[in-house]
Amino acid sequence: MTELSAPFAPDWVLAPGESVLDLAEERGWTQGELAQRLGYSEKHISQLINGKVPITVDAAQRLERVLGSSMDFWLKLEANYQKHKARLEATERHACWISWLDELPVKELMSSGAIAKVRNVAKNKPGIVESCRRFFGVASPDEWRSHYGGMQVAFRRSRDEQSDVGAISAWLRLGEQVAEKLDGPKYDKARFAHALKEIRGLTCEPPEIFEPRMRTLLHDAGVLLALVPAIPRAHVSGVARWLSPTRPLIQLSLYGKTNDKFWFTFFHEA
């Protein structure tokens, strides 16, 4: 495994007001004189210099006239400052969420390519938190718990008492990602019933025969099929759920793909 470190991101950022102050000092102006030239109060200029108030379009126009740099320059400076500020604030939040990683199968997610492979050391953990947020598509661990903890789905588990919520949620999300890449017609109940009858006739066939035919039959009936390798500690054989009112998903973990257990799980979920 190639071990990467998190990308460099400085933990400091200068407010655009620093540039305003530098240009004013080059001209030998005090903050009071600068305020007078810009038509602002000294308090407002002090807040602008210290990053307490943003450079608005109006302020950028005034700075262009008084200090010479273009309005676009000042607005871009402000936008970059706000972006870096937001990134630093997010990093601080991520530091508070590091314990969330203990609930997730981070190693398995890295191995599967779901999140980037980096060394799972203290300095990289905030970045891993961000990768996991993006993978699950949630704003914070609280939303993750609310979404995946409250999902009303019918699980078939091999060991209920040993199942891990973090591992199950990761497996479910991997299935969602597979489904997101699939398209097809809306769900057709009659076609699905017909598909199940034909699929029952495939149970004695090897995977290379039954799998493509099975996918085609389900696709034509508007049913998505996701075969997702099992994740340790999830102990989930299969799950059936609706991703939307017209998009049902059957997700199987490939436990016993070549024996009766695979088919038992499929027909249980179907």
Question: For each predicted feature, which ranges?
Answer:
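DNA major-groove recognition helix of helix-turn-helix
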Residues: 24, 49, 59-60, 67, ...
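A short, Lys/Arg-rich alpha-helix, primarily the initiator
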Residues: 2-29
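Conserved binding/catalytic microenvironments
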Residues: 3-6, 149-270
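Recognition helix of helix-turn-helix/homeodomain-like DNA-binding domains
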Residues: 38-64
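Key DNA-contact positions within bacterial/archaeal DNA-binding proteins
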Residues: 32, 43, 72
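Residues within the helices of the helix-turn-helix
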Residues: 21, 32, 61
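Short amphipathic recognition helices of helix-turn-helix/homeodomain-type DNA-binding modules
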Residues: 65-98, 104-114
